[in-house]
Each structure stands twice: as structure tokens, then as C-alpha cells.
């Protein structure tokens, strides 16, 4: 009889342990790190279509709490701004772009080059000149200017305007697929 009771307790403890691990994994995914995949070519050459990445979700919340902003050139994942949800984007979808402007910055595109506060921005990840012009834009308070690395084929701030910082979900941390490209996503 005691061996049956012992087996039941052991089985019960195993289930409790498994449940605890599942809850920890869900909590980590919900609050700390989340896997995502790249659905479009807007971040080529940095990220390719179908790449799998991990995003870190704590920093944007800490930044907002202490009224800080992401670093320039950080690759961020965010909920679509209102203008995109009004034309059919789901509130549950996510976009990925690079931060090129912070609140108070003046952003401009002239002769295929991006300028921030009157200075040309050096961007070694951009493979071709920008195929559009954009007069000087002032980035509003609590907003960011975000652009895809594939600037001529990206639905980004140059089309829909500044991104509210409250829309940030996380920052790109590392690529885990394909295996030959596994590693951190670096920012100069």
C-alpha cells in the first residue's frame, strides 16, 4: 500500500514540476524573450525573409518607465501605428524596423542620403541610395522615426510618419535561424 501511495505522490510531484516549468516558460515568453520570424524583405540585408529571431521585451518597458529612448540604430519590433490599423493592419501584428530618429531630431532625405539634425548618417548596412526625397521632419515627443534597412522597399516612417514609443514590443536580440547565420543582431 505504501508503494502505491509513494508512486501517486511521485507522479503528482512530477506533474507539479512540469506545470511549474511550463508556467515559467510561458512567463518568460510573455514578459522577457519571444521568438519571431521575418515575413518580408523590409530589413534586407540585415535580416532575410523567413529568418527567425529572438526579441528582448524588458528594455522598452524600462525605457518608458524612466522616460528613456532606444539607442539609435537599434532594430525594434512594434505594434502597427494607428494609421496602419485604420487601413487594415491587425492590432496583433508586429513590424520590425531600425530606429533612425529620436524625439526632437530632424530627419531628412536628400539626394539618396539620410540626414539627422543636418548631418549625413553613415549606414554601412544600406546597399543602395534611397530612391525618394523627404523634406525635413521633426520627430515629436514620445515618438521615433523608424526605417527598414531595405529603404526603397519598406513600409515605414517615411510613408506613415512617426512611431509612438508606446507601440514598442521589444528589440531584436539574436538570429537563431538559419543556423549558418546564428548570432547576435549587432548595432554599430
Residue ranges: model-predicted function:
Residues 1-11:
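N-terminal Lys/Arg-rich, disordered targeting/topogenic segments
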Residues 12-15, 21, 25-138:
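Feature for secretory/organellar precursors and membrane-associated catalytic proteins
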Residues 59, 158-160, 170-188:
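Extracytoplasmic/periplasmic terminal helices and flexible tails
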Residues 62, 153-154:
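Active-site environment of divalent metal-dependent phosphoester hydrolases
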Residues 145:
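PRPP/pyrophosphate-binding module of the type I phosphoribosyltransferase fold
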Residues 148:
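Phosphate/adenylate-binding glycine loop and adjacent helical scaffold
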